[in-house]
Amino acid sequence: MANITVTFTITEFCLHTGVTEEELNEIVGLGVIEPYEDDNTDWQFDDRAASVVQRALRLREELALDWPGIAVALTLLEENSRLREENRLLLQRLSRFISHP
């Protein structure tokens, strides 16, 4: 199965997500998203970056956070998700050793 990556130029990305170029520069500077790796010198972003920015915009709207706060919140949410998955896997392993009547 082919793996297709959709990329956006800066202008397309801003139009698609609703962020300004200034906000995009701040978001990239904070490490919330990174430009898509390409030989092209102009920034390009993939569809995953668009999803992250849309999630960030929801946090901004719902919690009235600034971009640095959103960066921290997204980092904590990702860590929480990773830990939940690790916990699920460990519980699955543990259940093999616990007898069920």
From Swiss-Prot:
Gene3D superfamilies: 1.10.1660.10. Coiled coil: none annotated. InterPro entries: CbpM. Belongs to the CbpM family. Interacts with CbpA and inhibits both the DnaJ-like co-chaperone activity and the DNA binding activity of CbpA. Together with CbpA, modulates the activity of the DnaK chaperone system. Does not inhibit the co-chaperone activity of DnaJ. NCBIfam families: PRK10265.1. HAMAP family: CbpM (MF_01155). This is Chaperone modulatory protein CbpM.
